A protein has these predicted regions:
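Oxyanion-binding "anion nests"
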Residues: 180, 196, 202-205, 211
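Acyl-donor-binding surface of acyltransferase catalytic domains
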Residues: 52, 79-161, 298-302
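Conserved donor-binding loop and adjoining core beta-sheet/short helix segment
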Residues: 8-11, 15-112, 215, 220-243
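Short loop/turn motifs at secondary-structure junctions and domain boundaries
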Residues: 35-39, 201-206
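Short amphipathic alpha-helix that is part of the acyltransferase structural core
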Residues: 1-34, 46-48, 53, 148-190, ...
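Conserved acetyl-CoA-binding loop-helix of GNAT-fold acetyltransferases
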Residues: 83-96, 123, 242, 248-261, ...
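Active-site/acyl-donor-binding loops of N-acyltransferases
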Residues: 124-143, 209, 261, 266-312
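Glycine-rich acetyl-CoA-binding "A-motif" of GNAT/NAT acetyltransferases
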Residues: 52-55, 116, 129, 207, ...
Length: 312
């Protein structure tokens, strides 16, 4: 028997399922709990088969989706429990919640080597709207890169200058909409309060690894490392953004070098990142280092399930 309960029933089980299915984007119970509290529109569920937790899902209107026809969803089922209707039932729950938010579509993520996950989306009429070229940088034996700053540019961190968080958000407001995506709305960081709760607080946030590029007193770029697996020594490049007027001058390269140097000094084992395949400039910065490819991340978009019954 398949039973679907509120995700808050067991954060540890939800985190384990997400991590097992996503593999390259692991999470923790603390992050699951924090994200739920930070996102007022979020609903999540845990699926059990004969009492065993085998699936997890969530649906939320992210800050950049307020004017979009889509909501964001994660639907994860452990491989051994697939082809038994668990994913379909979770899809119905996410669709019902998306409909309550006034949405007609969902955006879901899968890695390209998860054939079942990709097929699940494609069978339901979902199309790929973004392909992330995913990479990992193993730090063992890597020499610290030199940090070459353009004239008039200096680096600091949010740990040293916590007063610069609002300027960092202003850079995000300019840079994030430039990320290529085949969607009805460009990507956006949301309000400062939303940006702060998602990127400047919580268990993933590392203030001393949030680098800010300054031109005089003005923030012109930033780059964040966030924890992927703190116990395992793995951090992820969450975002690297530069104001349009300062692009092509080496600002992004200096921030990337500072991030890698910090990771080496801190004793991390690995950094992970991903860039939309059309983001040529960002991929060129990564090409300077021995990043190794991992399975591409695919963002799909498609229609919610038909309104056959109330899955809530």
């Amino acid at each position: 028997m398949i039973e679907v309960v509120d995700g808050a029933t067991d954060d540890a089980a939800v985190a384990r399922i997400y991590s097992d299915v996503m593999r390259w984007s692991t999470t923790t119970p603390e992050r699951v709990h924090y994200f739920r509290g930070a996102m007022p529109t979020l609903r999540d569920w845990l699926a059990r088969v004969d009492g065993e937790a085998v699936g997890a899902a969530r649906c939320v209107e992210l800050p950049d989706m307020k004017e979009s026809e889509a909501a964001s969803a994660d639907i994860c089922v452990l491989p051994a429990a697939r082809q038994r209707g668990v994913g379909t039932l979770l899809f119905e729950h996410t669709s019902t919640h998306a409909r309550s938010l006034g949405k007609t579509e969902l955006e879901v993520f899968a890695y390209e080597d998860d054939a079942d996950g990709v097929a699940f989306a494609e069978r339901r009429g979902f199309r790929c709207i973004m392909r992330m070229r995913s990479l990992r940088l193993v730090l063992e034996g890597l020499e610290a890169p030199s940090i070459e700053l353009p004239d008039g540019v200096s680096l600091t961190t949010l740990a040293e200058r916590p007063d610069l968080g609002h300027q960092m958000w202003e850079v995000a407001c300019e840079a994030i909409p430039d990320i290529p995506i085949d969607s009805d709305m460009p990507m956006r960081p949301g309000t400062f309060e939303e940006f702060h709760s998602l990127h400047l607080a919580g268990p993933r946030f590392i203030s001393e690894a949030t680098f800010l590029a300054l031109h005089g007193d003005d923030v012109i770029g930033y780059g964040q490392l966030e924890w992927q697996d703190r116990a395992g020594g793995i951090a992820v490049h969450e975002m690297l953004a530069v104001r349009r007027a300062f692009r092509g001058r080496g600002v992004a390269g200096a921030i990337k070098a500072a991030q890698i140097s910090w990771a080496l000094e801190t004793g991390l084992d690995e950094l992970r990142t991903g860039n939309e395949e059309r983001n040529v400039a960002a991929r060129a910065v990564n090409a300077r280092y021995p990043y190794q490819p991992t399975p591409d991340g695919l963002l799909f978009r498609g229609p919610i399930a038909s309104d056959t019954h109330d899955a809530e």
